[in-house]
C-alpha cells in the first residue's frame, strides 16, 4: 500500500515537470544585479543568461528565453555605443537563470523529510 503513494509523492516533490517553463527576463544592463521578471518560454526554448565583455569597460548581462540552437554562441552586440562580445549560457528548468535562492534547498529538504516521515508512519500503521 505504501508503494502506491510513491508515484504521488514523486509528482508532488518534483517541480517543473509540467512542460511549462518560465525564465527570468531582464534587458541588457551594466548593473551587477538583474532581478528581472518572469517570462514564459516556448517549447523549443531554454532559459539563458548573456554575459558581455568589452575592453576597458565593465561587463553587461541579460536574461530571458532563447532557441536551444543559440545556446553557447558568442555574438557582437552594441550597448551604450560600445560593442560587446555577448556569450549566451543556457540552462534547462523552471526559472533556472534566476539568482540562486538559498531557502529553496532548505525547503526542499524539509519537504522531503516530512514526506519520508509520513511514508514511514503509514508503513507502520498499515
Curated annotation (Swiss-Prot):
Record-level GO BP terms: binding of sperm to zona pellucida; cell adhesion; sperm-egg recognition
Q: Keyword Lipoprotein, does the record have it?
A: yes
InterPro entries registered for this protein in UniProt: LY6_UPA_recep-like, Snake_toxin-like_sf, SPACA4/Bouncer
GPI-anchor amidated asparagine-type lipidated residues: 97
| Removed propeptide positions | 98-126
Q: Does the keyword Protein transport apply?
A: no
GO CC terms for this protein? inner acrosomal membrane; membrane; outer acrosomal membrane; plasma membrane; side of membrane
**Membrane topology type:** Lipid-anchor; GPI-anchor
Disulfide cysteine pairs (residue numbers):
23-47, 26-34, 41-65, 71-90, 91-96
The compartments listed are: Cell membrane; Cytoplasmic vesicle, Secretory vesicle, Acrosome; Cytoplasmic vesicle, Secretory vesicle, Acrosome inner membrane; Cytoplasmic vesicle, Secretory vesicle, Acrosome outer membrane
PANTHER family recorded? SPERM ACROSOME MEMBRANE-ASSOCIATED PROTEIN 4
What this chain does, per the entry, is described as: Sperm surface membrane protein that is essential for effective sperm-zona pellucida binding and penetration during fertilization.
Q: Which family does it belong to?
A: Belongs to the SPACA4/bouncer family.
User: What is the protein's given name?
Assistant: Sperm acrosome membrane-associated protein 4
Query: Which organism is the protein's source?
Result: Bos taurus (Bovine)
> What lineage does UniProt assign to this protein's organism?
Eukaryota, Metazoa, Chordata, Craniata, Vertebrata
| Gene behind the chain | SPACA4
